[in-house]
Design a protein with these regions (language model features):
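Class I SAM-dependent methyltransferase SAM/SAH-binding core
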Residues: 55-100
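A short glycine-rich, Lys/Arg-flanked "PGG" loop and its adjoining helix->strand segment in the class I
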Residues: 128-140
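SAM-dependent methyltransferase
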Residues: 145-219
Length: 254
């Protein structure tokens, strides 16, 4: 299954990975806003280049940022547009691969890629291309924010599952996530999302999968520096109130 197919299929139910998506939108907006302000206090414009159904874009727009959200999944973008309208938020959304951001017009104070999107890129060249593209969309002195899973920890522990998420509505749904590592010492793995839905006749199951490549902090830091970023910092999840660690980096003023 391609990344596009994965997110197209998950778009109607992607919110189920959160205990309460509306609360997550608010909490993540607060956390990312605080992180941005700690490094770039006067930031106003944000490009969310892997916005999905809009979790961070919605949260930041509600805090006054001018946001453009881009993604490879048209169905996720359709969902994000509807969510923005429902909340009365003025957010532009358009389809764009994060490796091809140079095709977009304009530059921004901040470019973000959250929710472990970058590790969908399975080669060093693809990661380098994406980082260069993010760099190209920043104003001089602008800030990049990237959040990924804690791969320094994951590459040691090799977790194979996350705690099931039970969503008590009607119908009841249970989300199970499995991590299927290709090799005990390699970076490649497949994530399987299993969504169980309670029916009058029993339970139905839908399955969605996507490929990832674990990338540790040192490797991502080196790749960002090679792309031109400076003043690169890592922030622990618990320190910033986010569910993943974050890397921030600056484009030099010119």
């Amino acid at each position: 299954m391609s990344v596009v197919d994965f997110y197209d299929e998950l778009a109607p139910e992607f919110h189920l990975i959160y205990e309460d998506w509306n609360i997550a939108i608010d909490h993540q907006g607060v956390a990312i806003d605080r992180l941005i302000r700690s490094r770039l206090p006067d930031a106003q414009s944000v490009l969310d280049c892997s916005c999905g159904i809009g979790t961070q874009a919605l949260g930041l727009a509600s805090r006054g940022y001018k946001v453009l959200g881009t993604d490879v999944s048209e169905r996720a973008l359709d969902r994000a547009r509807l969510e923005a309208i429902h909340r009365g938020l003025d957010i532009a959304f358009m389809a764009c691969d994060l490796r091809e951001l140079e095709t977009l017009q304009g530059t921004y104070d901040v470019v973000i890629s959250c929710d472990n999107a970058l590790p969908h890129l399975l080669t060093d060249d693809d990661v380098a291309q994406a980082l260069r593209a993010m760099y190209s969309k920043l104003l001089p002195g602008g800030l990049a924010v990237i959040t990924v899973r804690d791969y320094d920890k994951e590459l040691v522990e090799r977790s194979v599952t996350a705690a099931p998420r039970v969503n008590p509505g009607t119908p009841r749904k249970v989300v199970v996530r499995l991590h299927d590592w290709d090799a005990p010492d390699g970076p490649m793995y497949t994530v399987h999302f299993l969504i169980l839905t309670e029916r009058s006749t029993g339970w139905s199951i839908s399955h969605h999968s996507a490929r990832y490549r674990a990338i540790g902090r040192d490797a991502l830091t080196a790749a960002a520096a090679k792309a031109g970023f400076t003043n690169i910092r890592w922030h622990q999840a618990e320190d910033i109130g986010f569910y993943q660690p974050a890397m921030t980096a600056l484009r030099d003023g010119e």
